[in-house]
Amino acid sequence: MSTVLLILRRCALRHWRLAFKQQLALMLILALGSSVYLAVRLASNAALSGFETFTDGVTRQPDWTVQALTGSLHEADLLRMREALGPRPVSLLPVVEETVTPASDKGNGEIGSRATWRLLGVDFIALLNLRGQAPAGLGASNMQSVRSGVYVSPKLGAKAGEELRLIVDDRVITLQVAGVVPEVPGVPSLPAHLLLMDLPEAQSVLQRGDRIDRVEFLSQDSPLFPSLREETGRLLKAHWQVRGGSDRRQLAGTMTQAFRLNLTILSLLALLVGGYLIFQALDGVVLRRRNEIGILKSLGVTDRAIQIAFLLEAALLGLCGGALGVLLGWLGAQAAVGGVTKTMNALYGATSEQQASLSVSEALLALSISILASLIAAWWPARMAARTPPAHMLGNHATPFEGGTVWRVEWIGWAMMLAALLLAQLPVLRFENGTRLPLAGYTAALLWLVGAGLAASTILRFVARKKALSAVWRIALSHLRRPTVRHRFAVAALASAVAMTTGMAVMVASFDHTMRGWIDRTMKADIYVSSAGAQSASSTHAITPKTVAELGREPGVEELAFVQAKTLLWQGGEVLVLGTNPVFAYKHDLYAWVQAPQQKEWWKSDDAITPAIISESWSERFGTHVGDTIDLAGHKVRVVAMNAEYGNERGSLTLPSEVFRAWFDTDEAWRVALMLKPGVDAETVRSRIEAQQPGLSVFTNAHLRREALRIFRQTFSVTHALEVIGVIVAVVGLGLALTSLLLERRAVLATLHSLGMSRREIARSAALEGLGVACAGAFTGIAAGLWLGWLLVYRINKQCFGWTLQFHAVWWHLAVLGAAVIITGMLVAAMVGRWAALLPSEHTEE
């Protein structure tokens, strides 16, 4: 071990001092790979944390949460629950809940740009009966000081006595801040977004009457009831919908699982491309020290000592690069968290996190990734350096390294691509709560990317078949006819990066093309109306029947229709149940059918079973098909058709409006669509409604279309950043590969210069060699990327989200991508060639 440490101190660290810029560049390369993964991970975790926190209440986690099968619970149900439980020591906490939006927050005109808070009404008497559960400042000792209004967290920034103007459903109301609940260690504190109010007052403000949304149950341990929690749940499940206390938080993670998993996979694919770059950089380090390694071996240093010394140096580089990657990853996460949060807010539920925090475990994970990647990348160069005889490493005519047999066997790449084709045919892994994991699809994508990179050498030799009379061309092509491992890795990195970018571009184009067609089919009304507080997918705002009637009496309105919505728990996952006017939808042909109903008037039934339409996401998530009969909230439902819906991956079931009202005992609307009379200006009507109804958001058809496409583009904003990083890394890798190759050939370059070849011609030869590698990588990458796009569109997307997309490629985008990679690769190669043309025949440390 002393020999290894001596080599590190006298050789490795000396090179670090003499060539500090090169070592810093290596650290940056390592940092880039780990920081991309860490940034995406921190951003998605921060958004998820905000999403989960939005479900938190004011007590410890309840043992059970009880809701009605359909509709709302009533105060009389509390007596039934208490009678069912008998003398068991279980506390009941009735709750009403509504999302609210501050009226002062005007946003920027975009859906989701305004804040979303929660107004929580709880029974203060029941809350105070829970020892240690009441937030500080609401203890029994000062119950008489409890005033009318809302209690808020200090994080909200409001003061006692201050008035808050809030949007609730379609109304703008004013509530007074009754007090600010201080934060005390060991006592539950209010989340920043939560407004707490006494239950009777909240019922009055929200116009709920005697209705409540849910009841939280907290069991108290007792020797008389050793299995109290399980017994309580069993008794309640006989009459009501019962969830475990942790289900709300777990459901938040489940809903966003596919979205977050896709981000993670993309960041890991970018890390794969970075792995090629790390290999080439460390291979260059070994190459620069070949003479030194040869001298050490001649002095009797063992192969094992040399290999261990290089691996330890690589680990040290990985540690330094990883530490830098943690910093870059944290900074990148701050930039990415906004985009990820907006996407989750629009598609899943309210989350307002704008900062990503870094934990010790996440930092250690990033360091581990960097060190592991460095060791893996350094293992092969270190092994070859240790095993190469000294005679092959010393002097001006050291033998060029062409790579081991495994790197020259191209059939391995083709075999991996064949395996990817077979894996793409396997079904998705399904779990009991309806979530899916396309493990075979992700594995197929990985094998296809790596296999395409390894098989790209075939294209490299095809490019080299070009006959040339010029000496510059002949020299450039001669190196490509017998490519070394550095050529192969350079073209593999380019092919993988271009394939990843092409595949994502095809998926985005397919989504865009499909979305536009779906929007044209389903958005035919002139004006769409929702509550101004509906800023996220979890918003519970509704429009009252009175307001709907006023909209129908608006001058210029010819037809009005509305959609009702409720969220239910079905087979362990949340689903959306919709109620629509089927006659209006049939008249205007609003459905984009995946499987059309057998009879046009699908809402009519000959028996007691309710007809319904499911979305494609529902079918993919739960395995329900047209013709199946399911049990939903105590009702028999027959699936008569399936429609395409691209804004909801949880799945939706559509009922006739009469059935919906009977099930849920409500006439409130979720969204309202207005058809205007011919010649009426939609913008004029929109402005008039907004002036008369400040609690509503009103969108013209054109505006809502733009918003839908904006949310779609926002969803893929992080994806585009990862694509750009991958291509940049691959092009830099090409430059590093050529640098190593030309360093290895510096004696040959000196000979060519002595024979009369000018330095400019040497630089041109290097540029043409880089052009050949770039062409092979670009052509292979685009071809492989088209199949990868097919995999993403028809397999991974379908299995993750349940959406069928129409395959669509923007060919001129792909042509621009290929041209950009080729031109950039040639320019990088030319710069390296100009530098190499000035190299002396003997290497000196720089």
Model-flagged regions — what are they?
Residues 65-72, 458-598, 616, 707, ...:
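Juxtamembrane segments of multi-pass membrane proteins
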Residues 2-272, 284-287, 303, 343, ...:
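Membrane transport/envelope proteins' first extracytoplasmic loop
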Residues 18, 22-24, 34-62, 283, ...:
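Alpha-helical transmembrane segments
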Residues 20-45, 257-291, 315-329, 369-376, ...:
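Hydrophobic alpha-helical transmembrane segments of multi-pass inner-membrane transport and secretion
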Residues 113-157, 537, 545-626:
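Short beta-strand boundary microenvironments
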Residues 1-6, 10-26, 234, 258-261, ...:
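Alpha-helical transmembrane segments, especially those used as permease/efflux helices
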Residues 279-282, 315-348, 361-387, 414-430, ...:
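Small-residue-rich transmembrane alpha-helices
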